């Protein structure tokens, strides 16, 4: 079903058409007072109810963060929109797009001859040897500070690229897999780029 939660999601789950008004009534029935919510689990259940929490948020979030929702801060929930319309996009910006020639070409055009780029370089080994007005560091944050506050617990991602000889592999550009799968989502890029 479509995600983030929207009218299409509710219609498919409950097997009946949902309007904005009907969705508002549903959420008024299942919502709780968010004032005392301190964890992701608390705020998610208070916002969408226990059923939608179990269906969409709990397992996906725990898989993504590698921690129980009871241990995650409530602020994390705010990154996931809940829509009272049929918009199935994750972002709702008025203008969204992908560079016509791709991101690599865009970055090449942005580069300037006055820029000095160091790749595969340990910042700690060169920091006293370089001078700069502005520095863009793209390594681990804790490494930048030479681990003075210890190591941050990082999660890694593994991307598996596959090519399928079919006009359409799945219904939407991005489909999340919240339950017992070894992966969190599948993206069909041609649906993003047209």
Question: What does each model-found stretch correspond to?
Answer:
Residues 1:
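N-terminal FAD cofactor-binding segment of flavoenzymes
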Residues 4:
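Short aromatic/basic micro-patch
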Residues 121-194:
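Mid-domain catalytic core of redox enzymes
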């Amino acid at each position: 079903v479509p995600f983030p939660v929207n009218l299409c999601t509710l219609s498919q789950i409950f097997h009946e058409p949902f309007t904005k008004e009907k969705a508002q009534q549903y959420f008024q029935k299942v919502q709780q007072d968010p004032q005392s919510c301190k964890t992701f689990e608390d705020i998610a259940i208070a916002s969408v109810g226990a059923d939608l929490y179990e269906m969409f948020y709990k397992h996906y979030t725990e898989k993504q963060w590698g921690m129980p929702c009871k241990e995650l801060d409530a602020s994390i929930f705010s990154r996931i929109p809940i829509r009272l319309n049929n918009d199935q996009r994750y972002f709702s910006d008025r203008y969204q797009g992908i560079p016509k020639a791709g991101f690599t070409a865009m970055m090449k055009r942005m580069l300037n001859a006055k820029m000095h780029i160091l790749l595969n370089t340990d910042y700690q080994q060169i920091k006293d040897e370089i001078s700069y007005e502005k520095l863009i560091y793209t390594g681990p944050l804790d490494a930048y500070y030479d681990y003075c506050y210890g190591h941050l617990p990082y999660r890694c991602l593994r991307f598996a690229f596959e090519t399928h000889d079919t006009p359409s592999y799945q219904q939407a550009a991005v489909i999340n897999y919240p339950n017992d799968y070894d992966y969190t989502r599948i993206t069909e890029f041609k649906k993003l780029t047209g």
